[in-house]
Structure formats: structure tokens, C-alpha cells
Amino acid sequence: MKTEVKICGLKTAEALQRAVALGASHTGFIFFPKSPRNIEPDDAGRLAELARGRAKIVAVTVDADNDDLDEIVSALHPEVLQLHGSENPERVLAIKALYGLPVIKALPIREASDLERIAPYIGIADRFLLDAKPPAGSDLPGGNGVSFDWRLLDALDANVDYMLSGGLNASNVEDALALTGARAIDTSSGVESAPGIKDLTLMDAFFEAIRRAEA
């Protein structure tokens, strides 16, 4: 089965076009000023047209208010919203009602008890993004290049639709797929030469590793 792959934090046409050419199913644009991958909505909207119809356009936000979401949705016309902050189930439901878009809810995982965070969102979030908890002192909820113990997902209900995230790169993605059986994965820092700088060679290697895992 072909793995769904989201390349997140895209900021240039070159990186976006390479991701799509390599077979990315989702392209992620991050709207969070503290992130080195932050992009202005109008810039993201122009970039997204290079991928529209070939990969899903995902807007990634962190505890954004309605004014910010209005601006992002108007400029980008995303097909999916990824909520990567502390949005509670009621907020997720309100956002879905407001925009009529499917929602990926990101949840931080470090230990088995963190999987209990999923249950309140069942039937509300359309999919989960299971990411490693940020290291102490980090201002970023994701894109930190750290992984969690993938064996924790052995306890996950098989019906939970999720994307695996957190420190995935060409050197570990085969193991991650083999251990978890994940059908969808996400990376950002794993295909960068520096924070926010996508590296086409690393992107090539990442997809090569995924195809080996699928063989």
C-alpha cells in the first residue's frame, strides 16, 4: 500500500514542486510566527497553486483565532486544516463548523498515557497527527526533529486514523513504518539542511527510503 506523505513547512516553489514530483500526498504551509517555517498567507496562496489538484493543501496553525483563520483560509483555500496547538474538542468542532473543512488534530506523545488525549477528539477530528512532545524550552509545538517511542502505538485502536510525525528522516523512516504500520507520515525538519531550509537531496532520500519500505 502506498504511504501518504505530508511534507510540511514548505516555503519555496523549488521545494514544493520537488515534493509533489516525488509523490507527496499533502503539502503543509505553517502559519506560526515563531516557526522558521512560517509563511505569509498570500505567499502560501501563490505557492499552493503549484500543487493544487496534485497534492492536498494543508494549513497548519497553532491556537489561531478566527480572524487569523479567516485570513489564512481566504488566501490559501486549503483542503485540510491542521490544528497544532492546544485546541480543545469544542474549539475543533467550532472550526469545522465555521469552515466546512476536514481537520487534522496534532497531539504530542511521549509516554503511553499521552494516547489518552485522543479519545475526546474521536468523532470530531478527521485524523490525528501524532508528534513527539517538544523538548524542554522549545517554542515550537512541532518541527523539533525529535521522535517518540513508536512502540507506544501498539496500544492504539486500529480504527484511529493518524499520521506519524516527529523526527522522521531518511535514516529512520523505514524502521518507523515497519514498527508502526503507519499508512500516513509527516516530516518537516527531516528534509532540511537548516531550520526552515528544505534540502532537495534529503527529500529525495526520504522518498527513496519510503519506497524501499513499501517494496
From Swiss-Prot:
Its EC number is 5.3.1.24. InterPro entries: Aldolase_TIM, PRAI_dom, RibuloseP-bd_barrel, TrpF_fam. SUPFAM superfamilies: Ribulose-phoshate binding barrel. It comes from the Bacteria. Pfam families: PRAI (PF00697). It catalyses: N-(5-phospho-beta-D-ribosyl)anthranilate = 1-(2-carboxyphenylamino)-1-deoxy-D-ribulose 5-phosphate. One of its GO terms (biological process) is L-tryptophan biosynthetic process. Pathway: Amino-acid biosynthesis; L-tryptophan biosynthesis; L-tryptophan from chorismate: step 3/5. Keywords: Amino-acid biosynthesis, Aromatic amino acid biosynthesis, Isomerase, Tryptophan biosynthesis. The keyword RNA-binding does not apply. Gene3D superfamilies: Aldolase class I (3.20.20.70). The keyword Isomerase applies. GO terms for molecular function: phosphoribosylanthranilate isomerase activity. It is an enzyme of class 5 (isomerase). NCBIfam families: PRK01222.1-1. Belongs to the TrpF family. This is N-(5'-phosphoribosyl)anthranilate isomerase.
